[in-house]
A protein has these predicted regions:
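Histidine-centered divalent metal-coordination motifs
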Residues: 65, 115, 158
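Catalytic beta-strand/loop cores that center a nucleophilic Ser/Cys/Thr
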Residues: 99-150
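Short gly/ser/thr-rich secondary-structure transition/capping motifs
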Residues: 10-18, 42, 94-95, 111-114, ...
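Conserved beta-strand segments of alpha/beta enzyme cores
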Residues: 10-12, 60, 78, 110, ...
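A glycine-centered loop/beta-turn motif at secondary-structure junctions
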Residues: 135-179
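Cysteine-nucleophile active-site neighborhood
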Residues: 27-104, 110
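N-terminal beta1-alpha1 cap of cysteine-dependent amidohydrolase-like domains
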Residues: 1-60, 66, 165-179
Length: 179
């Protein structure tokens, strides 16, 4: 939320188990939605999947960590246990396929990961392109996705983490806010 506030955009933080689609639509009336990290699976993340299904064709959406997984699952992807659990670990991310949220970032950058779940790459719906990967045990792990038709993005890593370069994390958030 702090990186968003730094762009001058007002922020409303809502708990996924203490709000409703109706409240979001009729009272909050957001111009964009960020679905943030959390300690559970998309199935346990309150209304996150419902929010994605309701707003994906109406508003830009960015999912971070659990939000990224929720986006994948909302469109039919399968969330699986990661081969390597990453909590507070810095990894090298790729910047692929000219995503708007990675505009101005180098082709490789370091970011912090806190997760034990990932989107199974074999299940990634065809309506998404991969915009970032990392390697775990010489295998690609999806670190970023972008919908082919709507401004819906997910990043498995944490742009807001102290272990992610502040310049890169802020750039991702400001790129999203400027959509």
């Amino acid at each position: 939320a702090h990186y968003i506030e730094e762009t001058g955009v007002p922020v409303n933080v809502l708990r996924n188990d203490k709000t409703s689609i109706k409240e979001i639509k009729n009272i909050i009336k957001p111009s964009k939605i960020i679905i943030s990290p959390g300690p559970c699976t998309p199935n346990e993340a309150g209304i996150c999947i419902d929010v994605i299904k309701e707003f994906h064709n109406k508003l830009p959406i960015l999912g971070v960590c659990l939000g990224h997984q929720s986006i994948g699952q909302a469109f039919g992807g399968i969330i699986v246990q990661a081969k390597k659990i990453m909590h507070g670990k810095i990894s090298s991310m790729t910047n692929e396929n000219n995503s708007e949220i990675f505009r101005g970032l180098p082709k490789k950058f370091d970011a912090t990961r806190y997760h034990s779940l990932v989107i199974d790459p074999k299940s990634l719906p065809s309506c998404f392109k991969i915009i970032s990967n990392t390697k775990d045990n010489d295998k690609d792990v999806i670190m970023g996705i972008e919908h082919n038709d709507y401004p819906v993005f997910g990043v498995q890593f944490h742009p807001e983490s102290i272990g992610t370069s502040k310049v890169h994390g802020q750039k991702i958030i400001s790129n999203f806010v400027s959509l």
